[in-house]
UniProtKB/Swiss-Prot annotation:
The lineage of its organism: Bacteria, Pseudomonadati, Pseudomonadota, Betaproteobacteria, Burkholderiales. It is an enzyme of class 2 (transferase). Its EC number is 2.7.7.-, 2.7.7.108. GO terms for molecular function: AMPylase activity; ATP binding; magnesium ion binding. Keywords: ATP-binding, Magnesium, Manganese, Metal-binding, Nucleotide-binding, Nucleotidyltransferase, Transferase. Its cofactor is Mg(2+); Mn(2+). InterPro entries: SelO. It catalyses: L-seryl-[protein] + ATP = 3-O-(5'-adenylyl)-L-seryl-[protein] + diphosphate; L-threonyl-[protein] + ATP = 3-O-(5'-adenylyl)-L-threonyl-[protein] + diphosphate; L-tyrosyl-[protein] + ATP = O-(5'-adenylyl)-L-tyrosyl-[protein] + diphosphate; L-histidyl-[protein] + UTP = N(tele)-(5'-uridylyl)-L-histidyl-[protein] + diphosphate. Mg(2+) binds at residues 272, 281. Belongs to the SELO family. Nucleotidyltransferase involved in the post-translational modification of proteins. It can catalyze the addition of adenosine monophosphate (AMP) or uridine monophosphate (UMP) to a protein, resulting in modifications known as AMPylation and UMPylation. This is Protein nucleotidyltransferase YdiU. The active site is at 271 (proton acceptor).
Length: 522
């Protein structure tokens, strides 16, 4: 899996593909030095086969239309080299640390992920390719370094679904399966998912060098991130404080978008927080079905730390962890000779930045909810109206996605058209009371029902990756039928379109879906 254009380094069976993938090595992160990563080959995955491939991501990377049909494709993205790995092309696993479920976990790192190369995108950006499930690394701890088919399909589907919802995310290029057994809560089979992102740097990377008292390496990492992804920060009075602010604001925006579509991440540890404000590390995630503000999507989260309603608070807390890690760098430009005085000012400056999180998150979520309700004009009580709807949904366990989608059918003047959304509520009197408030608010709007409905349908998805939809695709894939993975991926590429031929994918979950559980055991 060399990404070199050299014929000597290319896989014999993949001359055209190797040339396409070609080139500039492993990217800028690997040049930071050995303190940041370990170079090693992937562990071969026996008899790999293609489960799914995103044509859109392939196009983003400039890969040909025939990319996924070339001989050796599965071998390449399973991490199986057909000859010895050239030293300059060895993949790498990066080291980081972090807080897990609010507790300092110490050194972590890419325990089953290997970055295999970097390619220029057709959008002018550069993208790292990382295989998840490529075998043990020095950071695997007690793990086997493998990913399972179940979690790999879920990550593949949700990465692309989130992108098409307009939510910042890592992307997914391929899923490669194998019949190799692995032990989790039960015996499962191995798989590798290829993730694509401008960067996989996490809050935990900064925490690692802070906790190891290596301000020199911390600064090297921060400079890398600033120069490559936040160049405007270099022009600020304090580039490292500006980096903290940029990451904090992006994180606030991201979580506001999560809340607006009912997405629960499930494992918001600091090592799962992207410095670029991307959704990263799709594990026991879930979209809320019957709305419960206390919804916990991760079976392993017994305390509810990462419940739906907690996500904004946890994201803010994680930004505090990032701020602590950056403190040794903040204020260096001020030339304060006294270390204690500089540290005190750094804390004050960081606190001021962190105070901007709620200032950013609140209005961002209000804008999103106003759009979901089809409100073009801004009114003081709009947040109260939205919150009252959520409270009513919570009390009736109304379906999150369908409630907002069907609200578009409600008329300003005719309550007889309320049935499609009203029927989602157990307490219909409570819904009627809210609907009366909503109509009063709509009377202040200038758009007619049709224009409002069209606007609402552009922001309220009809199709999201519900757990039971993923489960059906996974069960069929286990029988070597990958058609449902492809079909579901196609539906989720157009989440806001009606797609009448796929109406079943927008239905309420079946009764058996209530017994599904997802956990960290992927």
């Amino acid at each position: 899996m060399s990404f070199s254009r050299s014929a000597a380094d290319a896989a014999d069976t993949l001359p055209d593909l190797a040339a396409t993938l070609g080139a500039p090595a492993l990217g800028a992160f690997v040049t930071l030095g050995d303190a940041f990563h370990t170079r090693l080959p992937a562990a071969p995955l026996p008899a790999p086969y293609v489960v799914g491939c995103s044509d859109e991501v392939a196009q983003l990377l400039g890969l040909p239309a025939s990319f996924a049909t070339q001989p050796g494709f599965a071998e390449l993205f399973a991490g199986n080299p057909t000859r010895d790995w050239p030293a300059h092309a060895l993949p790498y696993a990066s080291v980081y640390s972090g807080h897990q479920f609010g507790v300092w976990a110490g050194q972590l790192g890419d325990g089953r992920a290997l970055t295999i190369g970097e390619l220029p995108g057709t959008d002018g950006r550069r993208y790292e390719l990382q295989i998840k499930g490529g075998g043990r690394t020095p950071y695997s701890r007690m793990g086997d370094g493998r990913a399972v088919l179940r979690s790999s399909i879920r990550e593949f589907l949700c990465s692309e679904a989130m992108h098409h919802l307009g939510i910042p995310t890592t992307r997914a290029l391929t899923v490669i399966g194998s019949d190799q057994p692995v032990v989790r809560e039960e015996i499962e089979t191995s798989a590798v998912v290829t993730r694509v992102s401008e960067s996989f740097v996490r809050f935990g990377h900064f925490e690692h060098f802070f906790s190891n008292d290596r301000p020199d390496l911390l600064r090297q990492l921060a400079d890398h991130v600033i120069d490559r992804f936040y160049p405007a920060c270099r022009e600020a009075d304090d580039p490292y404080l500006a980096l903290l602010e940029a990451a904090t604001l992006r994180t606030a925006d991201l979580v506001a978008q999560w809340q607006a579509v009912g997405f629960c991440h499930g494992v918001m540890n600091t090592d799962n927080m992207s410095i670029l404000g991307l959704t990263i590390d799709y594990g026991p995630f879930g979209f809320v079905d019957a709305f419960d503000a206390n919804h916990i999507c991760n079976h392993s989260d017994t305390s509810g730390r990462y419940a739906y309603r907690m996500q904004p608070r946890i994201a803010h807390w994680n930004c505090y962890c990032l701020a602590q890690a950056l403190l040794p760098l903040i204020g260096l430009q001020h030339g304060i000779a006294d270390d204690d005085a500089r540290a005190e000012r750094a804390v004050d400056d960081a606190q001021a930045v962190l105070a901007k999180f709620p200032e950013r998150f609140g209005p961002a979520l209000e804008r999103a909810m106003r759009a979901k309700l089809g409100l073009e004009l801004e009114r003081e009580n709009d947040a109260e109206l939205a919150n009252k709807l959520l409270e009513t949904m919570h009390a009736s366990h109304a379906d999150f996605t369908l409630t907002f989608r069907r609200l578009a059918q409600l008329s300003k003047h005719d309550a007889s058209r309320d049935a499609p959304v009203r029927d989602l509520f157990i307490d219909r009197d409570a819904f009627d009371a809210w609907a009366n408030l909503y109509r009063e608010r709509l009377s202040e709007e200038t758009r007619d029902d049709a224009a409002r409905a069209a606007a609402m349908n552009r922001v309220n998805p009809k199709y999201v990756l519900r757990n039971h939809l993923a489960e059906v695709a996974i069960r069929r894939a286990k029988e070597k039928d990958f058609s449902e993975v492809e079909r579901l991926a196609q539906v989720l590429r157009r989440p806001f379109d009606e797609q009448p031929e796929h109406e079943a994918y927008a239905a309420l979950p079946p009764d058996w879906a209530g017994s599904l559980e997802v956990s960290c055991s992927s």
